[in-house]
Structure formats: C-alpha cells, structure tokens
C-alpha cells in the first residue's frame, strides 16, 4: 500500500496517467481532471503526488519555495519521454523535447515552470526556452542568464545550446 490506493481505484490511476500522457504538457485544471475521472479534487492531488513519488510524473510549479503538499502543480510532464511513446497515441516533438529537458535537469537541479517567461527556470536563476533549431530569442530577449535549448543543433552558437547537451548532466 505504497500509495494508499484502494485496489478498486487502480483503473482510475491508469486512466489518469493515460489522460495526462495524451495531454502533456498539461496545464493543470484539477476540477476538469476530477470530473473526467469521477473522483474528488483531493483524490486527484493525492494521486498526482503518488505518481510523482513513483517517478511516473514531474509536477512543476512556478515557485517551488511556496509549494504545499495539496497544492495543484502549474504543469505536469510524464517523467520519462520514452513513456510518452508507450502511453500516448501521438507525441508532439515539442512535448518530447520539454519532457527530456525536465527529466534530465531535475536529476541534479530544481526545475520550475517558467509561467510568464521562458519554458523553465533552473535553480531559480537560469531561464530556458526549448525548441527546434530555428527557435528565436523573442520570448526571452531581455531576460538575463537565459538560453535556448535547440533540437537538431550540433554545437553551441552563442546562447543557443544543443538540446542533447542536457543529457550530459545526468
């Protein structure tokens, strides 16, 4: 009873995981999720916490310093991008990129959801925007200590870094 889940609710957990995989990155609406699963909001939050502890999900908050246990996350990602391909019918490449970044950087860093600027804030000081090789600095132009992590890039070009480089962090 690691997660304190009634055996009859395991189908709800599976349905929740499949729903989230198909809608990742999911900007959280606990009421809609609870309604979809036909469970209470507190149960949804409890299940999210259990799936986080089981390393099935990454729960991101815009400000990690003020997070409480029963607070809804700002964004949810599947823990490992490979799981996306196993659980979702189709995967958006942008979603896979972001899942990869969160998965790799969260092993050694605090990753926050960049709610207003950039995709992520790392250790409270570095702003990251994730995209393809044509990604521009428009969204993070005036932000100090900001970088783009770009797919299909072989080597760094200024503050534009290849996406694969975060894999060396693990």
Label the predicted regions.
Residues 1-115:
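Accessory nucleic acid-recognition modules appended to NTPase machines
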Residues 109, 124, 143-145:
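Short, well-ordered alpha-helix to beta-strand connector turns
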Residues 88, 93, 133-142, 157-158:
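Active-site-adjacent loop/helix micro-motif of nuclease/hydrolase catalytic cores
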Residues 105, 120-139:
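Conserved catalytic cores of phosphodiester-cleaving nucleases, focusing on short active-site segments
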Residues 154-170:
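Domain-level recognition of nuclease-like catalytic cores that cleave nucleotide substrates
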Residues 63, 82-83, 117, 126, ...:
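A broadly conserved detector of short glycine/acidic/proline-rich loop/turn motifs that flank catalytic sites
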Residues 53, 77-78, 127-129, 148:
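Short hydrophobic-aromatic micro-motifs
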Residues 145-156:
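Nucleic-acid nuclease catalytic cores
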């Amino acid at each position: 009873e690691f997660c304190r889940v009634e055996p009859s609710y395991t189908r709800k957990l599976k349905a929740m995981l499949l729903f989230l995989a198909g809608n990742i990155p999911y900007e959280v609406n606990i009421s809609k999720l609870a309604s979809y699963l036909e469970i209470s909001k507190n149960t949804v939050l409890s299940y999210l916490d259990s799936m986080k502890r089981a390393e099935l999900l990454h729960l991101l908050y815009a400000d990690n310093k003020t997070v409480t246990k029963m607070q809804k996350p700002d964004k949810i990602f599947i823990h490992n991008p490979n799981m996306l391909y196993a659980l979702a019918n189709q995967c958006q490449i942008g979603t896979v990129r972001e899942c990869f970044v969160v998965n790799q950087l969260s092993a050694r860093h605090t990753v926050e959801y960049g709610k207003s600027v950039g995709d992520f804030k790392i250790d409270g000081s570095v702003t990251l925007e994730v995209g393809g090789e044509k990604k521009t600095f428009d969204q993070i132009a005036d932000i100090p200590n900001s970088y783009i992590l770009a797919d299909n890039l072989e080597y760094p070009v200024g503050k534009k870094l290849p996406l694969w480089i975060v894999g060396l962090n693990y």
